[in-house]
From Swiss-Prot:
Biological-process GO terms, alphabetical: DNA replication; DNA synthesis involved in DNA repair; double-strand break repair; SOS response
Protein name: DNA replication and repair protein RecF
CDD domains: ABC_RecF
Positions that bind ATP: 30-37
Name of the gene this protein is made from: recF
Length: 368
């Protein structure tokens, strides 16, 4: 899939923008604070209905307006799709082909994106919540049902934690109802995550071995707070541990086990990647991003759109070459932001170059 056209109205520092793109590489050049990252954020927002930079929707609205409108014309294998998001102080409205979507799970996945931004370099050593978010964003695009089940899980988790904080004593019968619901939704969330990590590991290891010239292998480990011996009995084991932890959870006023506490670990040649070098971290993250692209195509039959936000300067020539080779081989529409073409040592033919200045975007040229 690829974005043929994007229109922004009152988004960040863009009062109004209408642009069309190449189905291959699109490079956006400009000084800092001109709107390059805002532009990629808009594509991300149109795909996932959320920003990767802020939770405050009001920050997305142009300073002298009260509403935001984003529309995009997306070419999928199945045909052209029009996406639209309207944002105001009353909330957000999402539409596919002018039809309002009642649930996010009906909208997300229509246009898949993979974002590679400087903050992704913190994925290995950052907080566990970053790694859970990484899993959730990918899975939500590949399997819309996952978003629905995760939403149900989080709703019941909030109910259970609220009860634990307010109750003077445990009502075993009431807690049993919440336990059953939490274990049911949570088990399905974990099953999806386990399948995803197993598939992602194979793709990521293939890319990592290519980047390291066969010197390194990459493995991923989904580490659950729920102890289970096989995937088919997660529900029973989860339910048992919730019941077992009633007193502990009541004392601590929160739920001590479940996918909301699960972790993802990375290993290079069998050693925890927390102890890897900076160069190895960059190779690991690059391998993951390329694996995301490959896996989304394998599981859905369509390519995602790749967003590279000021990361090419973080990669040496070898890693740049590997990334661009993958993009070209997989025929992935790619958006690259940069302050200079000097960092892009291996630009192929057929790219489209744009210049970004103070919230305006002007096409420079197509390189053939």
């Amino acid at each position: 899939m690829w974005i043929k056209e994007l229109e922004l109205k009152h988004y960040r520092n863009y009062d109004h923008l209408l642009a069309s793109f190449s189905s291959g590489l699109n490079v956006f050049i400009g000084n800092n604070a001109q709107g390059k990252t805002n532009f990629l954020e808009a594509i991300y927002f149109l795909s996932l209905t959320r920003s990767h930079r802020t939770r405050a929707d009001k920050e997305l609205i142009h300073f002298d307006h009260s509403t935001v409108s984003l529309t995009g014309k997306i070419q999928r294998i199945s045909g052209t799709v029009d996406l639209e998001i309207n944002l105001s102080d009353k909330g957000r409205v999402t539409k596919i082909n002018a039809l309002k979507q009642a649930k996010l799970s009906d909208y997300i996945g229509t246009m898949m994106v993979v974002l590679f931004a400087p903050e992704d370099l913190q994925l290995v050593k950052g907080a566990p919540s970053l790694r859970r978010k990484f899993i959730d964003i990918d899975l939500g695009q590949i399997k819309p049902v996952y978003l629905s089940e995760l939403s149900h899980y989080n709703h019941v988790l909030k109910q259970r934690n609220s009860y634990l904080k307010s109750a003077q004593q445990i009502d075993a019968a009431f807690l049993a109802v919440l336990d059953e619901q939490l274990a049911s939704y949570g088990a399905r969330v974990m099953e999806h995550r386990i399948d995803f990590i197993n598939a992602l590991e194979k793709e990521a290891n293939t890319h990592h071995q290519a980047i390291s010239n066969g010197l390194e292998s990459l493995s991923l480990s989904y580490q659950s707070s729920v102890v289970f011996d096989k995937k088919t009995n997660i529900y029973q084991q989860f339910l048992h541990q919730l019941e077992k932890n009633h007193q502990k959870d009541f004392f601590r006023k929160n739920t001590s086990v479940g996918p909301h506490r699960d972790e993802l670990a990375f290993y290079i040649n069998g050693m925890n990647a927390n102890f890897a070098s900076q160069g190895q971290h960059r190779s690991l993250i690059l391998s993951l991003k390329m694996a995301e692209v490959s896996l989304m195509k394998a599981l859905t039959g369509d390519n995602p759109i790749l967003l590279l936000d000021d990361v090419m300067s973080e990669l040496d020539n070898t890693r740049q070459t590997k990334l661009l080779e993958t993009v070209i081989k997989e025929n992935v529409q790619t958006f690259i932001t940069t302050t200079s073409l000097d960092h892009l040592s291996q630009l192929p033919e057929g790219i489209r170059i744009f210049h970004v200045t103070k919230g305006t975007v002007q096409i420079d040229s197509d390189i053939h």
